[in-house]
Amino acid sequence: MNKPANFSNIHKYYDLINTITTLGFDKSWRSQAARNLNPGSVLDLVSGTGASYKDLNNFDVTALDPDEQMLSLNKFDRKIVGRGEDLPFNENSFDNVLCCFVWRNISETEKAMNEIYRVLKPGGKFILLDMTRPKNSTLRILHKIGTFILLHFIGLITMNFKEYRFLYKSLDFYPQPEIHLNKNEYLSLDITRFGLFGFVYLAVFTK
C-alpha cells in the first residue's frame, strides 16, 4: 500500500475535510461512536488533531498518532507519537480503543488488530468508525465519482494533490467491512452502516 510520506502538509485542513466528505455528519457520528465506550480509559488510536476531544471529556484518554504536527493541534493532555502496528503499551492497559475515520490509512491492519487485542483489558471494546464504499454496485459507482471530484478538487485548491488523491484511493484499499473485519477470531463484532448510501460504518468489537 503506497502511503504519502505524512499528512503534515494538510494537518490544518484535515478535520475540515472529514466534515466535508461526511456531509457535515462527522461530529454526530463521533458522538455516536463514543456512546458505545465502556467507562474508564481510552486509547484514541491515530488521534490526529483530537477531533473526538469533546466526546471524551469523561474518560482517561491517551492520544496516539504517528504525526507530530497533527499532535501539536491535539487538545488531549497525554499525547504519544506512535503507530497502531506497534503500540508502546503493556498488555491489558485500556478499557477501550477508539479509532475514527483513519482505519483505512493504517498500512498493516492485521498487525494493528493484534496490537489492539493485546492492549485491551478483558471485556474491553474497540470502537471503529470509518468511511467505505456503499454495498450497492450502482451507488458505489456514484460514490466513487462524487468523492473523486470532491477530493481531487480540494487537493488542487490546497496545492496538496498527493495527499488528497491518497485519501480518495484509500476508500478502496480494503474489502467491504463486513468481510474485512470478520477475519479476527478473538473479538466479537457488530457492524452498523449509516450515512448517504451507507458509506460510513460503525464497528463495535468486544474482547
Functional labels for PLM-detected ranges:
Residues I20-T21, S52, T132-N182:
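C-terminal alpha-helical "lid/dimerization" subdomain adjacent to the S-adenosyl-L-methionine
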Residues T22-P39:
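Conserved alpha-helix/loop element of class I SAM-dependent methyltransferases that forms part
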Residues N96-E108:
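A short SAM/SAH-binding and catalytic strip from SAM-dependent methyltransferases
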Residues G124-M131:
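Conserved beta-strand signature within the Rossmann-like core of class I S-adenosyl-L-methionine
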